[in-house]
Curated annotation (Swiss-Prot):
GO terms for cellular component: ATP-binding cassette (ABC) transporter complex. It catalyses: sulfate(out) + ATP + H2O = sulfate(in) + ADP + phosphate + H(+); thiosulfate(out) + ATP + H2O = thiosulfate(in) + ADP + phosphate + H(+). It is found in: Cell inner membrane. It is an enzyme of class 7 (translocase). The lineage of its organism: Bacteria, Pseudomonadati, Pseudomonadota, Gammaproteobacteria, Enterobacterales. PROSITE patterns: ABC_TRANSPORTER_1 (PS00211), ABC_TRANSPORTER_2 (PS50893), CYSA (PS51237). ATP binds at G35, P36, S37, G38, S39, G40, K41, T42. GO terms for biological process: sulfate transmembrane transport. InterPro entries: AAA+_ATPase, ABC_SmlMolc_Importer, ABC_transporter-like_ATP-bd, ABC_transporter-like_CS, Mo/tungstate-bd_C_term_dom, P-loop_NTPase, Sulph_transpt1. SMART domains: AAA (SM00382). Its EC number is 7.3.2.3. This is Sulfate/thiosulfate import ATP-binding protein CysA. Keywords: ATP-binding, Cell inner membrane, Cell membrane, Membrane, Nucleotide-binding, Sulfate transport, Translocase, Transport.
Amino acid sequence: MSIEINNISKYFGRTKVLNDITLDIPSGQMVALLGPSGSGKTTLLRIIAGLENQNAGRLSFHGTDVSRLHARDRRVGFVFQHYALFRHMTVFDNIAFGLTVLPRRERPNAAAIKQKVGQLLEMVQLGHLAERFPSQLSGGQKQRVALARALAVEPQILLLDEPFGALDAQVRKELRRWLRQLHEELKFTSVFVTHDQEEAMEVADRVVVVSQGNIEQVGTPDEVWREPATRFVLEFLGEVNRLSGEIRGSQLFIGAHHWPLDLAPMHQGSVDLFLRPWEMEVSTQSSDRCPLPVQVLEVSPRGHFWQLTVQPIGWHQDPISVVLPEGNIDAPVRGNRYYVGGLNARLYSGNQLLQPIALAQSA
């Protein structure tokens, strides 16, 4: 079941929280709405579910306008962050609840409900806990029950609002893998909200990055990671170093160092230069490739690489992060002096992207 969102806007009072959102979600895809708190991602999810109404725009499922359709008639399953299980019901009864309240003409008989719930319990690997109550379950088990309950009515679309946000890190990882496997088996269309970048990258087929009610970028996890479309996406996804520079003519200056640009840009003056830690080279000797001196402040071993916090010497005020692959040089220690450069620097004037530059040859 595909989802088509066309020019949707939403106000709360005089505050506009969604700005003319347009997005197509193909049938069978798992899509992450990723953004910081207050970005509008949960509001968009609730509009898809029918729990909120848009002020403008059209929402369609597989080409059929559902904008005025009540939530109960949309055949959408919804999983909340805090489970929303009925405390007085067993696991079995929680999962069966949606089936028991269907209109009489659509409601399965007791035997069919029992069979369906049994299948769902096995699917979420909780068959041995059918008679327990929510208070007797772990957080991960509760979330599996909530997911089984949402799937019981065979929804056309599954929506999840930060489904793993209340769980500890290890349980989150396990449930992410499990949900992805379940999606591969059932091929349902799914949209989930998260502010966890790792979660979005690991689980989703496509990632929709949202900020201040706007869609900043839509793409595969690899696309939004490697080719950020806007300055917001670049700064929001992962760790990035921001350096201050200045363009004079066709030269970029950082402290006492300067590099030639291919063309003299229209913009002259102050710019921001962005480099991700793993896009920087590190050397024990100054060279054309690594001309910028730094001193190591912190060393964090990460298995096959070292994460370094270094203080630029004479060319930038604040510490920056650098990734040093294991084996390139001797194990780093605090106080070591190195030289760094970069091969994929991105230049911005405000929110405008200027030409990329390699900090590999200092003029």
